[in-house]
A protein has these predicted regions:
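Transmembrane helical core of 7TM receptor-like proteins
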Residues: 1-183
């Protein structure tokens, strides 16, 4: 799909560009988790280095946040196209689309970097077994040898910002679209 959108000039629209970014995220999700999981399955070695765990956590968190922000962008583009069709070209210029995508990647990377740096610098107990098939922040927090309630609060805040608010924004966007179609 990414190649098709890149090659066909008729598909050089904001929504198609956002769809290609979403496809890129899906490809990266697979390459973040599956290779290590497949290696563990084939070789029976279920360990990962501390650095490898940090890298996997960083990319997984980045992709999750970027996906949520891109879905908001897609909802916005859809809402503008349906509710304000005459303003679409003004509100959805190529520059605006590139800014939405770039902003999503930058915000996702900053959020993931903050969580990954913190999670890699807390003291861990001697037992470092994660009962999970990949490294992510909640699984690693359970291994900490310190009180992590403040950090867990920031994880909850981050999850609220990047999961609950996007869900509400997307729902409102669809509500606005349905209202416009109804009228």
């Amino acid at each position: 799909m990414i190649l098709l959108i890149f090659l066909d000039t008729h598909l050089h629209t904001p929504m198609c560009f956002l769809l290609s970014q979403l496809s890129l995220i899906d490809l990266n999700y697979i390459s973040t988790i599956v290779p290590k999981m497949a290696s563990d399955f084939l070789h029976g070695n279920k360990s990962i280095s501390f650095t490898g765990c940090g890298i996997q956590s960083f990319f997984f968190t980045t992709l999750a946040v970027v996906e949520a922000l891109l879905l908001i962008s897609m909802a916005y583009v859809r809402c503008i196209a349906i509710c304000f069709p005459l303003h679409y070209l003004i509100r959805m210029s190529k520059r605006v689309c590139v800014l939405m995508i770039t902003g999503s990647w930058i915000i996702g990377s900053i959020n993931a970097c903050a969580h990954t740096v913190y999670i890699l610098h807390i003291p861990y107990c001697p037992s470092r077994v994660i009962n999970h098939f990949f490294c992510d922040v909640p699984a690693m927090v359970t291994l900490a040898c310190m009180d992590t309630w403040v950090y867990e609060g920031t994880v909850l805040l981050s999850a609220t910002i990047f999961l609950v608010f996007p869900f509400i924004a997307i729902s409102c966007s669809y509500g606005r679209v349905l209202l416009a179609v109804y009228h």
